[in-house]
Amino acid sequence: MATGLLIGCSEDDFEKSIFGLEETGLDKNSYTYALDAYLEDNFLKSYNVQFIYRMEDLGTDMQKDLVPATYEQSKQLAVLCKYMWYDIYKELAGEKDVFLKKYSPRIIHLTGTPGFNSDGTETLGYATNGTKITLQAVNRLDYNLIEGHYGLNNMFFHTMHHEFTHILDQTISHPQAFNVISTGLYNSDWNSTPDEIAVGNGFVTSYASANNTEDWAETVSNYITKNQADWDEMLDIASYDWEQVDFKDDEERDSLTSLYTKALVYPASYNTDSIGRSFRLGSGEYKWVRKSIVRDQVTGKPVKDEDGKIQYLHNKAIDAIAVINQKVDLAREWLKENYQIDLDLLRKTVQERQYMTDENGNLITKTDGNGKITYVNRLTQPDPQNPEQTLMDSLLKTIDAYAVEK
């Protein structure tokens, strides 16, 4: 089953407060007291935010089969929300604490499983009326992974920044100049558009191609959370033209040696950079996504260069890299002018909290077996303040400190 990150967004109607700050009367004999007290101090009292980890049926999509988040996974996400989201904006925003009290969502709601959709995708998070963010699939949380489909960025942090951007955008609208950059390219059927084709059209993701509002939120959130290697890889994809084509006839499709079968069964064994990859449409049908190549106008056959190599088309119609950079520039100016937030400093701070840095403050990189640049996860490394434990252990102990001796 194909999976994809879906972020549901509805029209925002921001309210400064939707519940009071009266004493909650926590049960000190409860097994969950430590987490409950931590959430009360660090979210409810600090920012008027209810952090709900005990799944509430009425607060979820009743058409989906969902289970609650586990206590341990809820603890992990709670400290990560504070460390990777709230503490950063508190440090960088011009109004410090006041900024978050004004613009933070009023409810953060967790579910253990994602929302499984009929088209084969999974909903990992969504926002409701600008006051509530639901983070799903919490039981998959693995703080050992930052990048990748099941990494913290894709599963959680991207959603947080995406929805928070919507709240800021609804308070002070993003510039109209942004809306006309990709006029005519927005696509209501974005879920059937591969990321490569969307990126080649000047969008950071296929979801960004849904409309200018999602384009704005996706541009900001991806710029913040993507590390430099992944951002550069996306821009490289943007430098090419891409095409989506049908597989060949059913006879080839059914063959165990066909490209179709190889792509579905052994996708990691083939160089998708040169031959492309399969993509599942919302209808369940598979298409082939590949770079567009230079072809003979008469025969349709590939035209090779003097070294006998296939030639690829580069931005025949759209300078996608320039388009993406233009969108980021507008976001950079808007955040600085309206919220006194330096987008590049925000990105740098987020990534320095995610990854290890050297003595000069540069992110430490390494290369995996496939030649891909990777970064060292700071959460799993020794805490500089207490080298005998990892940073994640130290964060979790801030919850344990609330435990009552019995």
Where are these regions (language model features)?
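Acidic/polar, low-complexity intrinsically disordered N-terminal segments immediately downstream
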Residues: 10-94, 98, 283, 314-317, ...
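Auxiliary, metal-adjacent structural segments of Zn-dependent hydrolase domains
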Residues: 14, 75-133
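Active-site recognition of the HExxH zinc-binding catalytic motif
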Residues: 135, 147-175, 217
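Surface-exposed patches in mature extracellular/periplasmic domains of secreted proteins
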Residues: 89-110, 171-172, 230-246, 339-352
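Second-shell loop/turn segments in exported
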Residues: 63-71, 143-151, 155, 202-210, ...
